[in-house]
Amino acid sequence: MDNNNDDLHYCSFCNKAQNEVDKLITNSSDGLKVFICNECIELSHKAISQKKGGSFNSDYMSDVKLLLKKPEDIKIFLSKHVVGQEHAQHVLSVAMYNHCQSMAQFNAISDVEIEKSNVMLIGPTGSGKTLLAKTLAKVSDVPFAMADATTLTEAGYVGDDVESVLSRLLQAANYDVAKAQRGIVFIDEIDKITRKSESTSITRDVSGEGVQQALLKIMEGTVAYVPPQGGRKHPQQEFIQVDTNNILFICGGAFEGLNKIIEARKKGTSVGFGADISQSKEQKKKNTLHDVQPEDLIKFGLIPEFVGRVPITAVLDELDHEDLVHVLIEPRNALIKQYKALLAFSKVNLEFSDEAISAIAEKAMSYKTGARMLRAILESLLLDVMYTAGNGGFEGSTIVITKEMVELGKAVINHNNKGNVITVND
């Protein structure tokens, strides 16, 4: 068949023209254009379904969504849920786009094997590392699992082995192996399992280098044997085989002290005309972390092989007062929106003054845990209000949270409400 007709596109698999099939789907990249028709998609899915089962419609639509998501689309979605961290959003958008493209196996056309690139998120507590990873899974419509690296131990020791991470991913995918095999795993506190020293110790490092080595095996791509219900393996147990080649691993950690390692490497390079002596200590630390190199992570205590399997690094900045105000009011699932919705079920209109919102952010900053304390502050502040509203009180009323209430730590209500507005007691 002559494929030189400029007016027609052809399926790259069966060579049928676009006017011979119902649908012809292409990738959105500017490079090699690849086309696949609906008939080839159906045939491929049937071949897979005979062994693994599954629903054509859900799998087909999910795959199409993966193909059509551009980095810009991913970033727009992330920005609706995460405040700030523009650089991290940019990095993750590109990383997820490339990961989806490799999963679509366009590389099979060009005979180029594309290896996945796992991601390292470096940032202080409460800066949004976990939220970014969760939101990335949501925009990509893939299962998501999270693990705390400090709970993992190498095989033969008490604790969770690394396969337990994959068990959680299977559970998130409702034990659909094919779906789990393209999911996202977020491993938090990765900085807590660093090697204690650069020299080899004769004692076993149960939760340090040994765990890095164990994680390395599943992160670089292997067929793992996963206990169906999690927990430790035992001989009588049946295992589920999970191919980790297309699972995206995102690691996160605060890496306290990493800035000092970077500064030591750069010592002397900022002296003279290039030095900015006007920078604050916090600004200097922030800018330093953005210069992190693989050698710095190795010096910190990650083994070279592990660093090599997490080639993409994104640094998250500490949230300031303005950021915390935005966290409270701007995202699609902003905390204040959530509490207003909760009280709306009891027919109570909840409002916050601008000064109250600012005071909540100020109080959260005093804990030095980023956005993590915001919910706890609001829970304590609104406890009595939610209790009374849940019992039918305040129905049809408007409650205005003021700065004084925030400073007091709870919303003290004046039951002699005037103009349907309930205020703090004098």
From Swiss-Prot:
GO terms for cellular component: HslUV protease complex. GO terms for biological process: cell division; proteolysis involved in protein catabolic process. Keywords: ATP-binding, Chaperone, Metal-binding, Nucleotide-binding, Zinc. It comes from the Bacteria. Transmembrane segments: none annotated. One of its GO terms (molecular function) is protein dimerization activity. Zn(2+) binds at residues 11, 14, 37, 40. InterPro entries: AAA+_ATPase (IPR003593), ATP-dep_Clp_protease_ClpX (IPR050052), ATPase_AAA_core (IPR003959), Clp_ATPase_C (IPR019489), Clp_protease_ATP-bd_su_ClpX (IPR004487), ClpX_bact (IPR046425), P-loop_NTPase (IPR027417), Znf_CppX_C4 (IPR010603). ATP binds at residues 124-131. Residues 1-56 form the ClpX-type ZB domain. Pfam families: AAA_2, ClpB_D2-small, zf-C4_ClpX. Belongs to the ClpX chaperone family. Component of the ClpX-ClpP complex. Forms a hexameric ring that, in the presence of ATP, binds to fourteen ClpP subunits assembled into a disk-like structure with a central cavity, resembling the structure of eukaryotic proteasomes. NCBIfam families: clpX, PRK05342.1. ATP-dependent specificity component of the Clp protease. It directs the protease to specific substrates. Can perform chaperone functions in the absence of ClpP. This is ATP-dependent Clp protease ATP-binding subunit ClpX. It comes from Wolbachia sp. subsp. Brugia malayi (strain TRS).
